[in-house]
Amino acid sequence: GTNFAIWAAAATRVELCFFDDVNGKLVETKHELTHRNGPVFHGYFPGIKPGQRYGYRIDGEWNPARGWRFNPNKLLIDPNTHLLYGDLKYVPEIYSHQASDGVGTGNITIKDERDNAQYVPHSVVTANVKSDQVRLRTPWSKTIIYEAHVRGLTAFNLDIPEEERGTY
């Protein structure tokens, strides 16, 4: 089985959604995470194994002026996932607000009710493997820290449209 947990302090409801391909069709199964410890919603699912695709749908107040854009119609990836399945498709349905194109042009105060699951990557359950990475112990005397500024890096880059070069 697999434990799932997500921090969502201002959320009122969190659904964990599993995705499977059945006869060439994407099938979604939703499970409300009813266990909550403070800001963390969580649950254990005994039959879930590595390879299972999933995502979260999180509900709460829609108040763009406060930065709250909860929209249960939008599938979110797990911020702690180690693996993603699928590509992001730039279509209006991926935005939480009503967008008219793939770059999000539209009215950001109106919630979009369309589902986005077929257009966004899904998180994938991976095996619980201990990391064999070893922390580098480079002494400060041999450490180099590079500092870069967007303006300086882009001012003369010919791959960037001229009107955007050197801007933030």
Please provide the spans of the model-predicted regions.
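Insoluble glucan recognition modules
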Residues: 1-29, 33-34, 45, 144-146
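The feature marks proteins involved in alpha-glucan
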Residues: 28, 36-40, 47-145, 156-159, ...
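Residue-level recognition of well-ordered secondary-structure positions
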Residues: 7, 55-57, 149
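Short, intrinsically disordered, charge-balanced linker/junction segments flanking boundaries
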Residues: 165-168
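Short, solvent-exposed loop/turn segments at secondary-structure junctions
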Residues: 9-11, 61-63, 150-155
